[in-house]
A protein has these predicted regions:
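Active-site histidine-anchored catalytic micro-motif
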Residues: 1, 32-140, 147
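Short N-terminal amphipathic alpha-helices
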Residues: 1-5, 208
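Surface-exposed loop and adjacent secondary-structure segments within mature catalytic domains
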Residues: 4-36, 40
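Short, surface-exposed amphipathic charged segments that create phosphate/polyanion-binding patches used
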Residues: 16-24, 103-108, 150-151
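Short hydrophobic/aromatic-rich motifs at helix boundaries and adjacent loops
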Residues: 19-24, 44, 93-94, 161-165
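Short N-terminal secondary-structure initiator segments
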Residues: 30-48, 160-170, 177
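Conformational coupling and interaction surfaces
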Residues: 113-116, 120, 126-128, 132-231
């Protein structure tokens, strides 16, 4: 497995508590049973390695992004010709609902976090000609992580992969007294699944734009003269 690290930094960082979850997962015994842990590190940064991979491909490459678009935007800025090598972009981000999932000071709450993290990056990708398959909150809200699913994982924890899955999601338990954490949704799972099985979802074309400034920064909006995305 080849990994390229990113040196991209947020315009609006995720809450510290969320970021700390990465260290918790990294410390899980199941990931540290066999040492030393070795990965093939790319000498390039993430956006540079993306350029390399796209340029070396003999065919168009579909991209799956389940976080902010900063590295893709940086790659497009550095070498705009890579757009010719990209098939589709499957992205978990944005929402056209009245309210998003951002609760941050001096923000009106209409944005989704992956856009809000770097609104300018999303805007840059929107300005490209890349076909965007958007998995927004209105889609992911239909796939909550229910207690029944958690219980089923618990009963099947003898299976190593299921045990790891359950341990990871146990870090984000249902907290019924906190609105933003009352239910966890399978954002990244749905996005990845829709890439591998397109008939899993129904899509429609929406003309849209990204707001980059003001109290609504990071919001995706329907716009008659905006660029089309498959929602």
């Amino acid at each position: 497995l080849k990994v390229a690290s990113s040196d991209s930094r947020p315009v609006n960082p995720f809450p510290k508590e969320w970021r700390m979850h990465a260290f918790t997962v990294d410390a899980l015994p199941i990931l540290n049973e066999h040492k030393p842990i070795t990965v093939q590190d790319s000498p390039l940064k993430a956006h540079e390695d993306l350029i390399r991979a796209l340029k070396e491909s003999d065919e168009k490459v579909d991209l799956v992004f389940v976080g902010p678009l900063t590295d893709l935007a940086r790659a497009l800025d550095q070498d705009p010709t890579i757009e010719e090598n990209i098939g589709k972009l499957y992205w978990m981000g944005g929402t056209f609902l009245d309210m998003g999932n951002v609760e941050d000071p001096e923000h009106d709450g209409t944005a989704e976090w992956n856009v809000y993290w770097d609104p300018f990056a999303a805007k840059r990708v929107w300005e490209s000609g890349i076909q965007i398959e958007l998995v927004a909150l209105e889609s992911t809200n239909m796939v909550p992580l229910s207690l029944d699913v958690r219980d089923r994982w618990a009963k099947e924890r003898a299976i190593e992969g299921v045990d790891f899955l359950g341990q990871c999601y146990a870090i984000v338990p249902p907290l019924t007294h906190y609105v933003t954490n009352s239910t966890y949704f399978l954002w990244d799972v749905l996005t990845t699944a829709s890439f591998g099985k397109e008939d899993l979802v129904k899509r429609s074309v929406v003309n849209s734009d990204v707001i980059v400034a003001g109290a609504s920064r990071g919001r995706t909006v329907k716009a008659e003269n905006g660029r089309p995305v498959d929602l």
